[in-house]
């Protein structure tokens, strides 16, 4: 069995008492879970438009939480050219403590490299990969995704880690992603630069829809 917790931390304006309660909850959750992914709502302020209402901000925070769950599930359940199964996920996440998730999206020339780089420098990620113990890497694109591009994206992630990092990756082709490349990384055992390790959202891929996928607004910058 594998137990993964994905939680949000309060906005700063919600007060110190609520934050203290949340930190105590996260600490207790770490004792019961193999891995805990923490989403700091405060970081959302850096990527949301200033005109975003408070109600919409809380909805987005909740949606990020949902996307975090969906992202991990998709790594296992989405059929791929190079599959990532439950055993792979368990290898990376079992007993891993705190984890982060990053996602990058790109189109056009050099899209694979750009998507991988964006996954690493996402505004919701504030950490380095040099001390990572494990990385789950998912590369997705349309029917035009080439083996060369898969290699390019994987090389960006490998170069940001070390030879001791256990990297497991999968590659998926989805016709709705024509012209796009998405790179998702789930990283465990990473040294923090202060605060909880954050997670970036992954756009849900609904099997009921044939419409092209649109990335969240802050991924399109």
Regions inferred by a protein language model and the residue ranges of each:
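Tubulin/FtsZ superfamily GTPase core signature
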Residues: 1-221
